[in-house]
Amino acid sequence: MDLDQLDLNPRITAAVKRGRLKSVKEILCYSGPDLQRLTGLPSHDVQCLLRAASLHLRGSRVLSALHLFQQKESFPEQHQRLSLGCPVLDQFLGGGLPLEGITGLAGCSSAGKTQLALQLCLAVQFPRQYGGLEAGAVYICTEDAFPSKRLWQLIAQQRRLRTDAPEELIEKIRFSNHIFIEHAADVDTLLECVSKKVPILLSRGMARLVVVDSIAAPFRCEFHLQASAIRAKLLLSLGATLRRLSSTFRSPVLCINQVTDMVEDQQSVSRSLGASEERLSPALGITWANQLLMRLMVDRTHEDDVTTGLPRSPVRTLRVLFAPHLPLSSCCYTVSGEGIRGMPGTQSY
């Protein structure tokens, strides 16, 4: 940066140039006494020089976090999200999944975890103006076979689910051609997959979403209690690799997790009867929780109709357990042949 741009007495500027200092940043690399020796300026002139250089680099004023947030239109890449394919759920999650970081999705069986993951695998293929990233997805199965039948059902219903996108656009997307499926039944295979195979797809732009279904299965079946230290070390290694991939390629990572019952005393259990979801905790403990940017949890409960006494359709709820940009909140949703839809007016904060 040119020294003539500094608001200084010409005498000070000339002395700086005689000292062979060529930039403002170079000036700030020296202490006051060193600048005095290089330029021959007195102490008060050197202080004026340092102050002018600091003000020039700092800019006109200090920017607060609120100001940067309000300028998000000027930095669209930093605020981009991956849509879930449902406007209600997108609004609930502040636009969708963050592009950088690991999102954990935990919940009991039949709550809709895999359904949501499959819906994201389709949503990521849409153009950016429709919440997608115009790329495919990597789906890593660790316990069950890939649900291809359900995937084809969702593909066939995309025109009914994604009413925001033109039908011509949906017809052009070859959804099934851009979902890359891997099976990893043990920890070593999973680590090899995310460290060698997945980076190739991400670096070539063929995929921009990574799904692991589920993260807990290989760790829970391979390690006993005495091997908890080894398990923690491997979990940290896996988390670091997934975070690095997400940050390098700006691709969201969704890790589906199982749940375990929390151990409580008899008094606590008796108080929480009828609220079983409050006694469930995501598996793998604090070691894995520290790897996540955002943790979501889904649950599925049955309620009886007050008038008839017959069981109603199951009530499913998506909850935000922690996230740096979202409050603790919940939203109800339904699972149908078309996919997952949020229920308007059910958000609670």
Swiss-Prot record:
A biological process from GO: positive regulation of mitotic cell cycle spindle assembly checkpoint
UniProt GO MF annotations: ATP binding; ATP-dependent DNA damage sensor activity; crossover junction DNA endonuclease activity; four-way junction DNA binding
Transmembrane residue ranges: none
Subcellular localization, as worded in the UniProt entry: Nucleus; Cytoplasm; Cytoplasm, Perinuclear region; Mitochondrion matrix
Residues engaged in binding ATP: G107, C108, S109, S110, A111, G112, K113, T114
Subcellular location, principal: nucleus
Modification type N-acetylmethionine: residues: M1
UniProt keyword annotations, A-Z: Acetylation, ATP-binding, Cytoplasm, DNA damage, DNA recombination, DNA repair, DNA-binding, Mitochondrion, Nucleotide-binding, Nucleus
Gene3D superfamilies: P-loop containing nucleotide triphosphate hydrolases
Gene Ontology cellular component terms for the protein in this record: cytoplasm; cytosol; mitochondrial matrix; nucleoplasm; nucleus; perinuclear region of cytoplasm; Rad51C-XRCC3 complex; replication fork
PANTHER family per UniProt: DNA REPAIR PROTEIN XRCC3
Family: Belongs to the RecA family. RAD51 subfamily.
Cited function: Involved in the homologous recombination repair (HRR) pathway of double-stranded DNA, thought to repair chromosomal fragmentation, translocations and deletions. Part of the RAD21 paralog protein complex CX3 which acts in the BRCA1-BRCA2-dependent HR pathway. Upon DNA damage, CX3 acts downstream of RAD51 recruitment; the complex binds predominantly to the intersection of the four duplex arms of the Holliday junction (HJ) and to junctions of replication forks.
Name by which UniProt lists this protein: DNA repair protein XRCC3
Organism phylogeny: Eukaryota, Metazoa, Chordata, Craniata, Vertebrata
